Amino acid sequence: MASLKDMRVRIASTKATQKITKAMQMVAASKLRRAQLAAEAARPYAEKMDAVISNIAAASAGSPASSKLLAGTGRDQVHLLLVCTGERGLSGAFNSSIVRLARERALALMNQGKDVKFFCVGRKGYEQLRRQFEKQIIAHVDLRSVRQIGFVHAEDIAKQVIARFDAGEFDVCTLFYSRFKSVIAQIPTAQQIIPLVVEAPAANAAPVALYEYEPEEDEILSALLPRNVGVQIFRALLENNASFYGAQMSAMDNATRNAGEMIRKQTLVYNRTRQAMITKELIEIISGAEAV
């Protein structure tokens, strides 16, 4: 059985850990609101960008001059998985859930005879995927030094991805990230960004207004499509940022509660052990006095 001193040290250590988890919870809570607002503000812009491009693409359907970012390469053999995760841990299943979704997609594609490559954004995803797919990781972007994510960071990633696409390194690119829903709910999401998936209008949808474009549709698309890749990546990074702080806040709250429960149990064991030792000493003193 541990001595009383060991028990006191253990209780003190648990209390110190509880203070750390509580502080991390408060920091995550303070950063969550701003990250949530940024993610929610980016959604309408990204969705509207998709809608505008879909409208223009419908007008230029079948044009031989259509951008490869829209028309694709005509093949479906090489898939690039753009996996966006966090740079830090202590956030519950936030990172592992994104990696799990990407890994499942990769294995499914490989079982179909497809070639799979990875482009990792974030240290945690890179470290996890490297164990199984090290030779298939073609790029890794580390954002640990970035204090606040801006469009310039997403644009830089988009340029790297598009350059590899233009060089013929892959045919399809799918973006993986965590969509923020609430503090306790973050949804791992996969979104194909190259070639862009243009959804056909529903049968009962209202007729779309006809527009005349200046310059030509293909010229507009050639300018908008690369930017759209950057916009979708930027949205994913913002969603990830909000999801990370939400997951970390929830995880640290659970850790703080668990530490409190451990302290309660450890203190109970300590008090019972101390009481038993005092009782034993009293019995020994009384027995000695009676013997005299």
UniProtKB/Swiss-Prot annotation:
TM ranges: none
GO annotation terms (biological process): proton motive force-driven plasma membrane ATP synthesis
Keyword list, A-Z: ATP synthesis, Cell inner membrane, Cell membrane, CF(1), Hydrogen ion transport, Ion transport, Membrane, Transport
Subcellular location: Cell inner membrane
Classification via PROSITE patterns: ATPASE_GAMMA
InterPro entries, sorted: ATP_synth_F1_ATPase_gsu, ATP_synth_F1_gsu, ATP_synth_F1_gsu_CS
GO cellular component, one term: proton-transporting ATP synthase complex
Signal sequence interval, chain numbering: none
Main location: membrane
Membrane topology: Peripheral membrane protein
One Pfam family hit: ATP-synt
GO terms, molecular function: ATP binding; proton-transporting ATP synthase activity, rotational mechanism
Function: Produces ATP from ADP in the presence of a proton gradient across the membrane. The gamma chain is believed to be important in regulating ATPase activity and the flow of protons through the CF(0) complex.
Subunit organization: F-type ATPases have 2 components, CF(1) - the catalytic core - and CF(0) - the membrane proton channel. CF(1) has five subunits: alpha(3), beta(3), gamma(1), delta(1), epsilon(1). CF(0) has three main subunits: a, b and c.
UniProt family annotation: Belongs to the ATPase gamma chain family.
NCBIfam families membership: ATPsyn_F1gamma, PRK05621.1-4
HAMAP family attached to this UniProt entry: ATP_synth_gamma_bact
Protein name: ATP synthase gamma chain
Taxonomic source organism: Bradyrhizobium sp. (strain ORS 278)
Gene of this entry: atpG
